[in-house]
Amino acid sequence: MKNQKNLAGVLLFIAGIIIFMGIITAESYYPLDDPYTTRENEISDLGATKPPNSIIKQPSANIFNTTMILTGIIILCATFLLQLESQNLLLTVPLGVLGIGVVGVGIFPGNITPWHSIFAFILFTAGGIGAILSYRFTRFPINLVFLVLGVIALFFLFFNELFIPYLGKGGTERFVAYPILFWMIGIGSYLAGTIQKKSAS
């Protein structure tokens, strides 16, 4: 890697892929005797459901929680590299808070209240804001995509009660989480790709 921004972009891209595949893997290992559905179950139910009567299913819980902790650390490393390279606070502040939220979700599964909910809210809020703010320093037309992803994430986060009757708790939460995940993969690709293009010229 020729510079820190390029490496940070690659790390964000990798973190997004690991989260996505980690969720899929944890879902695939969830026991069939207690079905997990994307409509009724929140993503974090893979780690542990909320009290009372919290349910923890292995190996799904270990897969999910480990994935969150690992990727949160990767995001924080990327944030550190970006701060050293550009000191773009519009990116590094929400990204750093996002990383802290991801780590917190892994350390404090759904059965640990109120900490899990606090870190999940931090994660979703920071991710949505980060996606919207990235409109300011990325180029057209991808900046519009990032803006829309951020708006979708925050809209479903703060108005989730409107959509739960139609999408379920799990479906509604995924309209918050997945746009943030797609933004993280996208901004990672953007940071890596633009630097490579400049280096080649």
How does the language model describe each region?
Residues K2-K5, C77-L91, Y135-L144, T194-A200:
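Membrane-interface helix-boundary motifs at transmembrane edges
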Residues N3-D33:
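N-terminal signal-anchor transmembrane alpha helix
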Residues A8-I19, F64-T67, T71, L91-L98, ...:
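Hydrophobic alpha-helical transmembrane segments of polytopic
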Residues S28-S44:
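Interfacial/capping segments of alpha-helical transmembrane domains
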Residues L46-I73:
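Interfacial helix-start motif at the membrane-water boundary
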Residues L95-Y135:
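Membrane-proximal helix-loop-helix units in multi-pass membrane proteins
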Residues Y135-S201:
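Terminal transmembrane helical module of multi-pass membrane proteins
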